[in-house]
Amino acid sequence: MANTAQARKRARQNTKRRQNSASQRSMVRTYLKRVDAAIAAKDYDAATEAYKKAVPVLDRMADKGILHKNKAARRKSRLNKTIKGLQA
């Protein structure tokens, strides 16, 4: 338990930040699930549209530090590669 005023404040801030981060991570997962669902259905147009909506979200979370920038880049690259495979 936090004993000083400073420690109590930090505990409050950490709780708020943890909740915000969890919400944002959940949002990223939702966007990625939409892309994955379109890929599973082998629907190129839907997958492309979902991917276009997911990319800015991934970039924003990487900028905020919710996701590591390399992880965001890797996810985008793999999704794009999979979508390009649907086109052929």
From Swiss-Prot:
GO terms for molecular function: small ribosomal subunit rRNA binding; structural constituent of ribosome. Residues 7-19 have a biased composition (Basic residues). Residues 1-26 are annotated as: Disordered. One of its GO terms (biological process) is translation. Pfam families: Ribosomal_S20p (PF01649). Keywords: Ribonucleoprotein, Ribosomal protein, RNA-binding, rRNA-binding. The keyword Ribonucleoprotein applies. GO terms for cellular component: cytosol; small ribosomal subunit. PANTHER family: 30S RIBOSOMAL PROTEIN S20 (PTHR33398), SMALL RIBOSOMAL SUBUNIT PROTEIN BS20C (PTHR33398:SF1). Belongs to the bacterial ribosomal protein bS20 family. Binds directly to 16S ribosomal RNA. HAMAP family: Ribosomal_bS20 (MF_00500). This is Small ribosomal subunit protein bS20. The gene is rpsT.
